[in-house]
Every structure is written in structure tokens, then in C-alpha cells.
Swiss-Prot record:
Stated name of the protein: TelA-like protein SAOUHSC_01408
Protein source organism: Staphylococcus aureus (strain NCTC 8325 / PS 47)
Other facts: Disruption of this gene leads to an increase in hla (alpha-hemolysin) transcription and proteases production.
Family: Belongs to the TelA family.
Length: 378
């Protein structure tokens, strides 16, 4: 491969990638440096008129190198599957999302039970799960770092391939210019000489030399076209290399962002969430204790008030209530009255019985007198 510097500060391939207009005639002879023009002249001398075998070999080494380069590019693309990198990043995002700080909200309707009993996701469970996920994230981070190292190496390799492609492009351009220069020389100098010689000569071989030269110029033109096709391949390969580099660079940046930003931020936010949750539970526990204390004080005050009122009321009462005395006196009076009535009734009954007994006694006496009288007369 011919070593030469770029034709200009801004390389044609870079212009092509930047969407600047570029064609096979972009690099003209007048844009060549003196050194490059010397290279073109040297290459042009390699083309010997009517040397068809030499013409066939002209630039073939460059085309073979381009073919090898294309195979190298194909192997690079086939061997570097970015799928596992995407899977690793997806796995990382899945792990980061598996622990949700919102799950740390353990508020319940009750008071002390809400604070001290087991909630749907206790802090210990969340913390344990976070530690497990953190360990998995650390392992994924190691994998991502390896991927990033490989991507960085691939980017450097692609830079080397890009530089090689630029060199192929430059060498092909020099060969194309040299061939075009030789073609113009043959068309403007050699062919007219042969044509003039054939016109002035009656030798049939002179006419054949004109035909052979014309065919050689046609083959040279075809060879220029083949080299231009190879040059076009180099031209199209440049943005392909850059696209692969851009994808690798984007993945490397994504990995770096995940390692240096996303993962530390996730760990910080989880630590903050756990700290805030502990603070919230501490405040809630303190609030519950305070509320319970206030409730107890209020209940005790109400009980004390009720006891004081009842005690004072009882102290102001006599040993026996007035109503009880009235009711008792009324019962005694009623008992006495009923007793007197019963006694009066008994007295009356006894008097009546006494009268009846006297009558009975009188009747008995009369009956006995009557019985004794007849007995005496007998």
C-alpha cells in the first residue's frame, strides 16, 4: 500500500459522512500536492501501453486488500453481538425497579397496631430485599464494566479500520488519477501518433496497432471504472464504520451512565427512603404514645371527676334518707292502725262470744232446772 498523507485537511470520507457532495472526480489533479503528483506519475508509469496482463494487475493489490478489509469488517460485525449488552442493561433496570420506595409506606388506620404490628411490607423486609437486589446490581455492574471495556476496545479497533479505509481510499484515488492521466496521455499523444503513422504507412500492422491501442484504452477505461467501484466501496464503508462506532459509543456511554449515575443514585434514594421511613415510623410511634398518654389522662380525669362528684354526693347524704324515714313511719303507723283495728275487731268478737257463752250458759241452766223439777214430783 502506498503511504501518503490526506489530499486535504478535511478528508473526502469525512466530508461524505458530513453529507457534503462527493463524487469520483472530487479529487482532481490540481488539488494534489507535489509529493502526491510524483506518486501519481510513478504509478502512471506502471501502465505500459498494450500490456494487457500488466493492466489487469494494475491496482489489484489494493482491491485484494479491500476484499480482506471487507472480510475483517464482516467478522467484526458478526462477532460483536450487542444483544447481551442490551439484555444486561434491561436486567439492571428490572432489578432497580424491583424495589419500589412507595412500598415503604406502611400507614394503617389503627394507632399502635399500625406502628408496631407487621404491615404489608415491613422495613426489614424491604431492607432485606434491597440488600439482595443491591448484591445482584453489583454483579450486573461487573458485567457492564466488562462490556464497556470490550466496547472501548472495539471503538479503538474501528478507528484503526476507519484509518485503513481512508488509506485505501487515498491509494485508490491516486491509482485512478494515475490511470486517468495515462489514458489522457494515450488518447492525446500515443493514439494520434499511431493513427498518423498508420495513415502514412501501407503496413497493415500499423493499422492493427491503432486498433490494439484503442482496445487498450478501452480496457484502461474499464479498469478505471473497476477502481472507481472499489473506491466507492471504501466511500460507503466509512459511514458504516462510523455507524457501528456510534452504536458502540452510545452503549458505552449508557453503561457508564448506569454505573456512575443510575446505580449510585438508586442506592442513595433507597437509603434516603429507608431513613425517611424510619423517621416517619419514629414520629408516628411518638405520636401514638403521646395520643395514648393524652387519652389515658383524659379518661383518668373524667373518672376522677365522676368519683369526686359521687363521693361528695354520698357525703352529703344522711345515714337514713328522709324518704326512707317517711316511708318507714308510714309503714309503722299503718301497722299500728291495722293492729288496733284487728284488736278492736277481736274485742268485739270476744264480747259477742262472751254474750253467746252467757246465753248458752243460761240456756243450759234453764234446761237443767227443767229436768230436775219433774224428777222431784215423782
Amino acid at each position: 500500500m502506498t503511504e501518503n498523507k490526506s489530499f486535504k485537511e478535511s478528508h473526502p470520507l469525512d466530508d461524505f459522512i458530513s453529507d457534503k457532495e462527493l463524487s469520483n472526480t472530487t479529487i482532481q489533479k490540481e488539488k494534489l500536492t507535489i509529493e502526491q503528483q510524483k506518486q501519481v506519475d510513478t504509478i502512471s508509469k506502471q501502465i505500459n501501453p498494450l500490456d494487457n496482463e500488466g493492466l489487469l494487475a494494475f491496482g489489484s493489490d489494493l482491491q485484494k486488500q479491500m476484499s480482506q478489509f471487507s472480510h475483517q469488517m464482516l467478522d467484526e460485525v458478526q462477532s460483536k453481538d450487542v444483544g447481551p449488552i442490551g439484555d444486561t442493561l434491561s436486567d439492571l433496570m428490572s432489578k432497580l425497579k424491583s424495589v419500589n420506595p412507595n412500598e415503604l409506606n406502611t400507614d394503617k388506620p389503627s394507632m399502635l397496631k399500625r406502628i408496631f404490628s407487621r404491615a404489608k411490607s415491613s422495613i426489614n423486609e424491604i431492607f432485606s430485599r434491597m440488600q439482595s437486589v443491591s448484591a445482584q446490581v453489583d454483579r450486573i455492574t461487573i458485567q457492564l464494566q466488562k462490556h464497556q471495556t470490550h466496547l472501548t476496545r472495539d471503538i479503538e479497533l474501528l478507528d484503526t479500520l476507519y484509518d485503513k479505509n481512508k488509506q485505501y481510499f487515498d491509494d485508490l484515488s491516486l491509482h485512478i488519477i494515475a490511470a486517468q492521466q495515462k489514458k489522457l496521455q494515450l488518447e492525446n499523444e500515443k493514439l494520434p501518433q499511431l493513427q498518423q503513422q498508420a495513415q502514412q504507412s501501407t503496413n497493415q500492422m500499423d493499422i492493427q496497432q491503432v486498433a490494439d491501442m484503442q482496445q487498450f484504452i478501452d480496457r484502461l477505461d474499464k479498469r478505471i471504472y473497476d477502481l472507481q467501484l472499489s473506491r466507492q466501496i471504501a466511500l460507503q464503508t466509512a459511514p458504516q464504520i462510523r455507524m457501528i462506532q456510534n452504536v458502540n459509543q452510545a452503549l458505552a456511554e449508557k453503561i457508564q451512565s448506569s454505573i456512575l449515575t443510575s446505580i449510585p443514585l438508586w442506592k442513595n434514594q433507597m437509603a434516603i427512603a429507608l431513613t425517611l421511613m424510619r423517621q416517619r415510623n419514629a414520629v408516628a410511634a411518638q405520636r401514638a404514645v403521646t395520643d395514648t398518654t393524652n387519652d389515658l389522662l383524659t379518661a383518668n380525669a373524667e373518672m376522677l371527676k365522676q368519683n369526686a362528684i359521687e363521693t361528695a354526693t354520698e357525703n352529703e347524704r344522711g345515714i337514713v334518707d328522709l324518704d326512707t324515714l317517711k316511708r318507714t313511719q308510714r309503714n309503722i303507723i299503718e301497722t299500728i292502725e291495722e293492729t288496733l283495728i284487728i284488736q278492736q275487731h277481736g274485742r268485739e268478737e270476744r264480747q259477742l262470744a262472751e254474750k253467746e257463752l252467757q246465753q248458752l250458759e243460761q240456756d243450759l241452766k234453764s234446761h237443767l232446772v227443767n229436768i230436775k223439777g219433774p224428777n222431784k214430783q215423782s
